[in-house]
């Protein structure tokens, strides 16, 4: 009998914990047809190509047939004079490299949070941050690496990270000065787990191609639901456009990257790798 009571109490406790974890929830959707994603041609880079039995597409826009939109970063808009108290997350924000792609495609972090860069591949990648407000970094990871720590970010900023070895590799980083942010999953849903005080807020949904959408929301008893709708007509450019001119440059911290300049181009509806242009 005691065991049953204990198990029931545990179940209730687990339910409360799960409920308490989800403070602000919602969904991001796309109104209209999503831009067609180009296939990435890795055929000239064997170590990359061998890891993908199926074609890999540019992941600038990841949307389902229902319009569920991934990689939307939702955050509380910090109005002038607003105080948003919150602890720096204890877990590190991790950017991984696997199969010659970045994961996650959009990394979010708070000022002061530990940052770790991983490489699951057994060959060279170069991690090149195109930041301006925060100190940029540019280093090579020549073999599998379970985690290289870099200095925590110090300033709010959004910037790109690229690989100078595999020019199609592109990720975004968004840095906040509060912990009230989350990124939508493939089903479009997101969950901000940091506890936000009750009140009226403006929430911002950001997507690299569709820009920003603002929504008002009321947090009551620690809970709120805020949904975002992006218009496909607001796409800044074809998803692979930014990847057409990605220069490969040498860097003192990555001697193996010293090679002639290479570019990513489109051909036959594919995004080509550095050597494929010659075919």
Where are the language model's segments positioned?
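Compositionally biased, low-complexity segments enriched in small residues
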Residues: 1, 14-15, 259, 263
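Bacterial N-terminal signal peptides that target proteins for export
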Residues: 1-8
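Bacterial N-terminal signal peptides
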Residues: 8-17
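Extracytoplasmic copper-binding redox domains, predominantly the cupredoxin/blue-copper superfamily
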Residues: 21-279
